[in-house]
Regions:
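Structural and coupling elements of P-loop NTPases
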Residues: 1-573
Length: 575
């Protein structure tokens, strides 16, 4: 598999609600392109993409995988992103390096909550968008209803580029509205024929609507079309289709069924022909507010690490998008964050778990490199002065305390999870200094469950979750005064001293009890100045264990305001 030129690259991320067939669509694309001999993940065939034991067990994707497909002169890098809520951070990372987000929608269920969330994320990233309406062979499938729901939710810029040839049990292929042909997948070959007469009127009406939508990409043609002066030629339609998709004027909607592999050939044809290349996308935002144009003409290589993976067999793997220039094995680049050098010893194209070594990678392409020190979100360049703006990961809202069943494994546990958190910024690990517990923060419970299963599988360390011990605090509600007295006689010189303390609530700006203040209000030398710090120290020592339940005391102001002592007995003199 050679390195594609920038203009031939199509980076497409598959997103949508979990369980709608995104991975199955990618597997169908691999099969129909000849990359795999059989349709992965179907009829007992092992999947190429969801290869992780946790993915196999749970039957959904938990990590982004890549399916590079050579089709009609284009390299289509399909990024199959997990969209289960706990792992959606990977989807955001994948979207940040693609030019097009392809939403897979179930023909029975329509657009669901995760689809909506990711739709607006793609809009914020200014990605081109497309929709594949899947599972049209199911009994309750309806392309028309799904189209209505999509347009109701996302607007009227969406338009069909293919229609279903039958639905439910009668679904037998698609009608291509650009080429005005019917297509049926027979094995891995798409058989083209004339549109059946019973679908002719529907197809012509949909074709006219498609022309009207994409004509908005050209003001002059739009006016002529609306005034009825002319219809769009095939050449004009195809040219406008590319422009309208790249400029986000139009969202193409495809009909199909990835298990039956119907409509997938046409989808790949249109991705290769009409979807934007990296140079059409524009510029990558930089951390300093500037931007970097993705270009093969710039001879200064810049690479962006959008994902890191700790593979038990292959070690640490960095997923990279080449932003400018050409990457080659042996190239030394500087990390903008650490200012340290990283050497690209080898470059690979990755398909699922399989890796194929390549001699170079051009701007716009997505490749992987092993054993880099770079972390997710890092930018590598010749000067180290270029730093891409980091994408925003979802907030970690789930916290749990864990501990090793064998107390001797605590350090091994912490080290493994710390490395996993560096690869996935949606997770973090911390050791609570007060309670001594190891705390994991993550997006959700399933994410932690996968992490602990991998910990046991790869290190044989068994960990369990335990309740987080809450670091309670004690405080006071009203002011009080008290006297403390010290008196000691040991046969020789005696010790005597007493002091009066006033303790009052200390309320912070937010209205909560917080902090500690010590005030010296002693006058007339009633207590020697040299002993005042000892009073403060004694108060703070007492605060550590609290008064009522043994929790630390906070939110108090303590004033020492009176006292007495016998100087001759305790041998103290004023400085």
């Amino acid at each position: 598999m050679g390195a594609p030129k920038t203009g031939n690259v199509r980076n497409v991320v598959l997103v949508g609600q979990g369980g709608v067939g995104k991975t199955s669509l990618a597997e169908a694309m691999l099969h129909l392109s000849g990359k795999t001999a059989r349709l992965g993940g179907h009829d007992g065939t092992k999947p190429t993409l969801d290869y992780d034991p946790e993915e196999v067990k749970r039957a959904f994707s938990i990590s982004t995988t890549i399916a590079p497909i050579d089709w009609k002169g284009a390299r289509i890098n399909v990024l199959d992103a997990p969209c289960y809520p706990d792992f959606i951070g990977d989807a955001f990372a994948a979207m940040s390096v693609c030019e097009t987000a392809l939403f897979v929608v179930d023909a029975e269920a329509g657009p669901q909550p995760t689809t909506v969330k990711l739709w607006y994320a793609a809009e914020d990233l200014r990605l081109a968008r497309a929709v594949f309406v899947n599972r049209l062979s199911r009994p309750e499938a309806s392309f028309a209803t799904t189209m209505d729901l999509l347009q109701e939710r996302f607007g009227t810029r969406l338009g069909a580029v293919t229609l279903p040839w039958g639905e439910g049990e009668d679904f037998d292929g698609i009608i291509d509205l650009v080429r005005m042909k019917a297509r049926h997948c027979n094995g891995t070959e798409a058989v083209e024929s004339e549109i059946p007469e019973e679908y002719r009127a529907q197809a012509e009406e949909a074709h006219d609507h498609l022309c009207e939508l994409v004509a908005e990409a050209d003001d002059e043609l739009m006016m002529k079309y609306l005034e009825g002066e002319e219809t769009l030629t095939q050449e004009e339609l195809e040219g406008l289709l590319s422009k309208a998709i790249a400029e986000r004027i139009f969202v193409p909607v495809f009909a199909g069924d990835c298990i039956k592999e119907q409509g997938v050939n046409s989808l790949m044809d249109d991705i290769a022909t009409y979807f934007p290349a990296p140079t059409d996308y524009g510029e990558m935002p930089l951390i300093d507010g500037d931007s970097l144009k993705i270009s093969s003409d710039d001879d200064r290589p810049v690479a962006f690490v959008f994902k890191t993976l700790a593979d038990p067999q292959q070690g640490r793997i960095s997923f990279i998008k080449v932003l400018t220039g050409t990457l080659e094995p042996g190239l030394e680049l500087i990390n903008a964050r650490t200012r340290k050098s990283d050497r690209l010893a080898h470059l690979y194209v990755m398909c699922g778990r399989d890796m194929t070594e390549v001699g170079h990678a051009y701007a716009g392409d997505i490749i992987v490199a092993p054993k880099l020190a770079a972390e997710t979100g890092d930018t590598l360049s010749i000067t180290g002065k270029v730093e891409a703006a980091a994408f925003k990961f979802p907030n970690s809202q789930y916290r749990i305390a864990i501990e090793a069943e064998n107390r001797g494994d605590e350090e091994k546990l912490y080290t493994f999870i710390e490395k996993a958190c560096k690869a996935d910024p949606t997770m973090s690990i911390d050791r609570d200094e007060e309670t001594g517990q190891t705390i994991i923060s993550a997006v959700g419970e399933a994410q932690v469950s996968v992490l602990l299963n991998r910990l046991e599988d790869r290190t044989k360390v068994v960990a369990k979750s335990v309740p987080i011990r809450i670091p309670y605090r004690e405080t006071i509600r009203r002011t009080a005064s008290a006297q403390g007295r010290h008196k000691k006689q040991t046969g020789g010189a005696g010790q005597y001293g007493d002091c009066w303390l006033r303790v009052e609530p200390l309320i912070g700006p937010d209205g909560t009890s917080d902090g500690y203040e010590f005030v010296d209000e002693v006058v007339g030398g009633r207590i020697p100045r040299s002993l005042i710090p000892a009073v403060d120290k004694g108060v703070q020592e007492t605060m550590k264990d609290g008064i009522i339940a043994g929790y630390p005391l906070t939110g108090i102001r303590v004033a020492v305001y009176d006292g007495s002592y016998h100087l001759s007995l305790i041998h103290i003199s004023e400085p």
